[in-house]
Amino acid sequence: KVVRDVIEKAGIRREQVAGLGISNQRETSAVWDRTDGHPLADAIVWQCSRAKDICARVEESGKAEWVRRTTGINLSPYFPASKLAWFMENVKEVPQKASGGP
């Protein structure tokens, strides 16, 4: 409703919106269907460490330093990228929806 109200107030069509930023507490991560806005899974809250095995695989591959140099952030299950990788590996719809692109 908020987004609809803002679009209406701005006097634009929804197709003109190129992106949307959402702020949340810490590094909580969520994925949703861009066509209908429905979540594809429950959000992973910032302190959840379910992506620790993904981080271990990255560490074992020798790419942890590259992650740190590229992002400025040490590899961690709290890092949103590791949560996104968890969604990609564990929620059937996520890779399918992600591969569809914009």
Labelled PLM ranges:
Residues 1-41, 65, 69:
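N-terminal glycine/serine-rich phosphate-binding loop of ATP-dependent small-molecule kinases
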Residues 22, 49, 67-102:
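Gly/Ser/Thr-rich active-site cleft segment
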Residues 32, 59, 79:
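A conserved hydrophobic position in a structured secondary element of the catalytic/binding core
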Residues 3, 7-11, 59-62, 88-95:
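Structural signal for hydrophobic packing residues in well-ordered secondary-structure cores
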Residues 27-29, 52, 94:
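Short, acidic Gly/Pro/Ser/Thr-rich loop/turn segments
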